[in-house]
Amino acid sequence: MESLALRSISLSASYLSLHRSSSKSFALLPPSISVHTSPTLRSLSISSPRFTLRATASSLPEEQNKPQPPPPSPPQPQGAKLIPLAISVSIGLIVRFLIPRPEQVTSQGWQLLSIFLFTISGLVLGPLPVGAWAFIGLTASIVTKTLPFSTAFAAFTNELIWLIAISFFFARGFIKTGLGDRIATYFVKWLGKSTLGLSYGLAFCETLMGLIMPSTMARAGGVFLPVIKSLAISAGSYPGDPSSRKLGSFLIQTQLQCSGASGAILLTSAAQNLLCLKLAREVGVVISNPWITWFKVASVPAFVSLLCTPLIIYKLYPPELKHTPEAPAAAAKKLERLGPITKNEWIMLGAMAFTVSLWVFGEAIGIASVVSAMIGLSTLLLLGVINWDDCLSDKSAWDSLTWFAVLIGMAGQLTNLGVVAWMSDCVAKLLQSLSLTWPASFIILQACYLLIHYLFASQTGHAGALYPPFLAMQIAAGVPGVLAALCLAFNNNLSGALAHYSGGPAALYYGAGYVDLRDMFRVGFVMALVQAIIWGGVGSFWWKFLGLY
């Protein structure tokens, strides 16, 4: 009993001592202790056992009263992840040394194929960041003397990759000036009651813009990526962060997967469409009244695809933020707070309108798309809307430029060295040996054309290398010429969302940092199957109705 009384007196004395020197004592309290005040009582909320020792053992030396530092965290592993590294290297070595080289393929071509597969597997498994691993693949191609230095780096002069980089800088301008936030707020005001409605609005808006902007790359980089980033950030969804799944990653995936259908619906919606038409004419397939014919054949399956794709991704890759019934009213109030458009927003809007005009009419006056983008960026730099430090600090732009150039260069050399032609010959011989009907040959060749795109980093390059031989094989198998020519062209558009390197928009959207690499491959493959079912199922009935077969 005496012991209990003494302990109570000690605790009371300690409390009074603390109460008299509260300012000094609270300055020494560890962060885990919070002080709550009521009108009649000041109490201590204790969540750390060290406070009890400090309150009752005030006679201990001052060093012992100091809060102890947290234990050091274990060091992060340095360098490449060993298991993904070992798997990637093993794939390259197995192809190079254990699988017999076909007679039709040169030693240089086979060695490049092994390095390409080594690079692609590393991009999927992720032993290092994407740009770093692509650079290692590039180095391997030079060290092994598979490619000379000038050839390995030749793709860094490719117009497409610089158009991608400049599009990132445009997106930076939209965000810096606040124009992207303003446009995004209007989208929320009109369509923002649900995330799904927002994705439908963006998808159909891109389809309509295909009438005036004949480049999926230009639409993605100049318009929709800045808007999506502004929408995501305004919702608290940030790249490279767990919050990316809140909104940004869903909108990125939806817009990328819808870009295939929006690029296929019109002859002028994508740059490679006109190339396919030209190549079909060289093979002997002439399409009369091409603009109208193209739209009639593509319209129904493309429209069904645009209706289904956002909903399927909503189930497959759902956003955390789904319903926002209060968002339109909040967006209207935000627009009032933003006030009138600022000077820099007008400059940004004017520069982009001028750039888009050059994208639309530039070909007629001899100005390429990348040159139009360079003129627009130069205008923004000269007028100070963005500065060079803004461009230098955009890591996504330079990272995308690096790895995409590496893959474009390797894929182009696979074509030049005969590897792609060998694959086409293998498919042709397989079909001949099976003696299939023309519908079966049509399905197999379309599937092969789609899947072989994993070896290409450019839809235009894919069409230039494989469109003529695959069209010729289908015609030889008895497939109606117009049906084969148009379906291969539609297929060429849909293949652009297979992976992060499948085309300019894919590289751009992946570079925004909202989607993990594995999710890019997973969603890309699943949606490729979905698109094949939609276009093959709905399309076959529609094309029969049109009399294509």
UniProtKB/Swiss-Prot annotation:
Keywords from the UniProt entry: Chloroplast, Membrane, Plastid, Plastid inner membrane, Transit peptide, Transmembrane, Transmembrane helix, Transport
Transit peptide per record: 1-54
Transmembrane portions of the chain: 79-99, 115-135, 151-171, 220-240, 247-267, 294-314, 344-364, 365-385, 403-423, 436-456, 470-490, 523-543
Localization terms from the record: Plastid, Chloroplast inner membrane
GO molecular function terms attached to this record: malate transmembrane transporter activity
One GO cellular component term: plastid
Assigned protein family: Belongs to the SLC13A/DASS transporter (TC 2.A.47) family. DIT1 subfamily.
This protein's name: Dicarboxylate transporter 2.2, chloroplastic
Native source organism of the sequence: Arabidopsis thaliana (Mouse-ear cress)
